[in-house]
Amino acid sequence: MAEAVAAPISPWTMAATIQAMERKIESQAARLLSLEGRTGMAEKKLADCEKTAVEFGNQLEGKWAVLGTLLQEYGLLQRRLENVENLLRNRNFWILRLPPGSKGESPKEWGKLEDWQKELYKHVMRGNYETLVSLDYAISKPEVLSQIEQGKEPCNWRRPGPKIPDVPVDPSPGSGPPVPAPDLLMQIKQEGELQLQEQQALGVEAWAAGQPDIGEEPWGLSQLDSGAGDISTDATSGVHSNFSTTIPPTSWQTDLPPHHPSSACSDGTLKLNTAASTEDVKIVIKTEVQEEEVVATPVHPTDLEAHGTLFGPGQATRFFPSPAQEGAWESQGSSFPSQDPVLGLREPARPERDMGELSPAVAQEETPPGDWLFGGVRWGWNFRCKPPVGLNPRTGPEGLPYSSPDNGEAILDPSQAPRPFNEPCKYPGRTKGFGHKPGLKKHPAAPPGGRPFTCATCGKSFQLQVSLSAHQRSCGAPDGSGPGTGGGGSGSGGGGGGSGGGSARDGSALRCGECGRCFTRPAHLIRHRMLHTGERPFPCTECEKRFTERSKLIDHYRTHTGVRPFTCTVCGKSFIRKDHLRKHQRNHAAGAKTPARGQPLPTPPAPPDPFKSPASKGPLASTDLVTDWTCGLSVLGPTDGGDM
């Protein structure tokens, strides 16, 4: 009985069992929550995949649509190619492209032309159309060429009869080249127009090389140039502006009707032009104008028209000689004037220049001109330096009188001859002198800006502000001494020896306003004021350095030319500046002993002869350059008699 009764369960055991069950339930609940989260993430990913599948489907549909469009365009292109092939099989069709708004037309005077002129025109027309070949355009052969080949009078538009229909052209201003009929399925592309412009720029050299020699034509040799054949189109008028020629009027001008005054040029030649319609092609042949910029003097357009100058679009103007000028040049031994890329047109070339001899030429430098530094150059010296031994300042190296730069004739009047080196040319309103008249011509009437600084008291004007400041102090002095009574005005740069020079001597008026320093001469005050203002009015033409004094600029310029005019009589060393030579001579006097009485001094080395070639020790050749040891300029030998 006692065994049947179960042992009582301990409360501690029950509590432990309950706690274990609770922990298990909590773990199961946490696991269930994690499974729910993972399920939500899987659902989101599934939704994203569905969206991506929909987008792929849309893109695939778009790709299929584009592919269908490409297939349709390919079919259109294939049919277009077949149409072009069919057109090419017919020999009556030419592939060409005409300029915008133009068509081929022959001269109205076709019946009055000779056979050789008709043949020349036929070659020009055929070459023009062959040059403009392009696969983008396919139209029938022009009627003008068909009539020319058959020997008929071309392009008689007024004559009744069947006429080949023209290609329809869009009259709008931005339509471009002529558009063929829609049944040809030809559309003008922008690339074709760019190709035509490139052909115009290159001058169609291949066409010019393949044409027959114009020199074999019976009507002349000198009317056409090697560059004839270049094609360019004027978009405004539709004219081939790079084709024009001048044909001698003696051959067929007399047969033309008298009511064509525009056919003859100003120089007696005749242009082979077509009808003056802005919508038609004007086929002419012209001498190609070489693109050279004339830097000499500006030329008025009327002067060029008087000489029969022909102009082309985008090309620089150039002189063409008149018959009178050609005769004058041929009488002097040359056919054309000598050209210089810097100086432009000069006087007619002389026979000695054609034989290889050189002539002195000085290019005008930019700011400042060369005359501001050396006072003008003709044979290598200026008004501050003596000419080399053996040369007369009034004549050339060979003793010949100077020639006029205008007509090349010798000057016989002594009053018109160039002045000597010690008589500088004066420009009105300027105190600076120049060594020769060409230098005076090249020198401007006034420096850039003129004389902008004016005194309010006396009305005098000055070029520099420091000059005006110094003048105002002397003009408004308490003792009343002005530029006329003081020691020279600042504008003139004179000394202090005036009649009323008290202000210049005591320095009461010549005082620096910045530092209070007094000076006895206005030039010294001006030079001192430049230190405060930083003005350096003398720039170097070789480098970017500027100087306050002209003498310093000349000394600096000798470092560029390599000239050392000051030579020591003891050792023969040369120096750029005179003070360097004096310092060197003091070193000789301090280190060397004085020779005894009666003992001869050492003979100094002879200075180099400026007209002896260093290599041959003989007379200077015409192509050798000689350095002027007096002023540091390079000049040519005396055998060259050409003017600058």
Curated annotation (Swiss-Prot):
PROSITE patterns from the UniProt entry = KRAB (PS50805), ZINC_FINGER_C2H2_1 (PS00028), ZINC_FINGER_C2H2_2 (PS50157)
Q: Where is this cross-link: Glycyl lysine isopeptide (Lys-Gly) (interchain with G-Cter in SUMO2)?
A: 282, 286
Residue ranges that the Swiss-Prot or TrEMBL entry lists as coiled coil: 16-92
In residue numbers, the region (Disordered) covers 153-176, 324-370, 472-503, 581-623
Composition bias, Gly residues: 479-503
* Location in the cell: Cytoplasm; Nucleus
- Zn finger regions (C2H2-type) covering which residues? 453-478, 510-532, 538-560, 566-588
Composition-biased stretches (Pro residues): 162-176, 601-611
Q: Which GO terms describe its molecular function?
A: DNA-binding transcription factor activity; DNA-binding transcription repressor activity, RNA polymerase II-specific; RNA polymerase II cis-regulatory region sequence-specific DNA binding; transcription cis-regulatory region binding; zinc ion binding
Say which family it is in: Belongs to the krueppel C2H2-type zinc-finger protein family.
Entry function: Transcription repressor that specifically binds to the 5'-TATTTT[T/G]-3' consensus sequence on promoters and repress transcription of PGC-1-alpha (PPARGC1A), thereby playing a role in regulation of neuron death.
Which additional comment does the entry carry?
May act as a downstream effector of PRKN and contribute to neurodegeneration in Parkinson disease cases caused by defects in PRKN: its accumulation due to the absence of PRKN, followed by up-regulation of PPARGC1A, could lead to the selective loss of dopamine neurons in the substantia nigra.
Q: What is this protein called?
A: Zinc finger protein 746
